[in-house]
Design a protein with these regions (language model features):
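Membrane-interface helix caps of multi-pass small-molecule transporters
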Residues: 16, 20, 37-40, 44-48, ...
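Transmembrane alpha-helical segments in multi-pass inner-membrane proteins
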Residues: 174-238
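Transmembrane helix-bundle core of multi-pass membrane transporters
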Residues: 65-124, 226-233, 258-274
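Loop-to-transmembrane alpha-helix initiation sites
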Residues: 53-55, 81-86, 104-110, 152, ...
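Cytosolic-side transmembrane-helix boundaries in multi-pass membrane proteins
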Residues: 136-143, 147-150, 221-274
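Hydrophobic core segments of alpha-helical transmembrane domains in multi-pass membrane transport
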Residues: 11-15, 65-66, 110-121, 159-167, ...
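Helix-loop-helix "hairpin" substructures at the membrane interface of multi-pass membrane proteins
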Residues: 23, 100-178, 201-202, 206
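Alpha-helical transmembrane segments within multi-pass membrane transporters and channels
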Residues: 22-67, 215
Length: 274
């Protein structure tokens, strides 16, 4: 739930580092470090202190929004250069999907590698089995001698660093200047995307393109001059999010299935069964 705040802070750090150094790599590193630190704080509250994860996530979202707004005001009017697209010869010419998948910047291509790598790690390695077990049956992992807290900390921090990459994408690619609330609620859509994807990295990729298409439609409809009220276009991506989540939830309940990790949101106490 804190993704919106983490993305805003990482976007702010990216913009500042890029503005001061001109290095995209340093800007990305700074974004990932800032996001990892905020995620580590969230982990401390939820894992070590066993605090409420919903409350901590919402607090983090509000904190990040306020912090980026406070320090971002001094950046209004400043600009940075954007990453260039790198078309893949031949593949970019594929009808309909070619440009969307194969005429992108290197960060998008990196996301493909990350999705494939995370899928392989989660479902085909011992480390991935431990991660999934910590989410499903932490008491079993503890009985086997695994450190539930350590694994959860590593996952929270690493996940936060990936969120930082998402936040960095805004100033590095989507805009070359700073505006207040730069992410415009994309962090909340990302939360919905996790549920839509059933916590599966491969499905998350396709879900991201679905929600991305909704956002693109909103912008293209305005450019094309379609006679659709602007407020309807602005709410379209978020309306789609609500509809998709409703459909997914109803379908899963009727099928008697749940893809949510059994121990999600639950603090771990040694010796207690979830």
């Amino acid at each position: 739930l804190g993704m919106e705040g983490i993305m805003l802070v990482s976007a702010l750090v990216t913009f500042v580092v890029d503005l001061k150094t001109g290095s995209k790599v340093l800007a990305l590193i700074g974004a990932m470090m800032a996001a990892g630190a905020l995620s580590g704080l969230h982990g401390f509250v939820c894992i070590s202190l066993r605090g409420n994860q919903i409350a901590s996530g919402l607090a983090l979202a509000l904190f990040g929004t306020g912090l980026s707004g406070l320090f971002g005001d001094t950046l209004i009017g400043s600009t940075v250069t954007s990453l260039n697209r790198i078309p893949i010869p031949g593949l970019e010419l594929i009808p309909i999907f070619g440009s969307a998948f194969f005429n992108q910047d290197w960060l998008v291509y990196l996301s493909y590698v990350l999705v494939a790598g995370l899928w392989f790690m989660l479902f085909h390695t011992n480390w991935g089995l431990q991660i999934r077990s910590v989410g499903e049956a932490p008491n079993v992992c503890d009985a086997l001698g695994l450190s539930v807290a350590k694994i959860r900390y590593l996952c929270v921090i690493f996940g936060g660093m990936l969120i930082g990459l998402g936040g960095a994408y805004f100033p590095l690619v989507l805009t070359s200047f700073w505006v207040d609330d730069l992410t415009a609620g994309r962090g909340w859509i990302a939360v919905a995307l996790v549920i839509f994807a059933f916590w599966h990295p491969g499905k998350a990729l396709w879900g991201a393109y679905l929600f991305g298409a909704a956002i693109a439609f909103q912008l293209q409809a305005q450019v094309m001059g379609l006679k659709i009220p602007s407020y309807i276009l602005e709410m379209f991506p978020y309306l789609l999010t609500i509809v998709v989540l409703t459909v997914v939830t109803v379908r899963n309940r009727r099928a008697g299935q749940t893809f949510m990790p059994a121990a999600l949101g639950l603090p771990f106490f040694r010796g207690e069964k979830h």
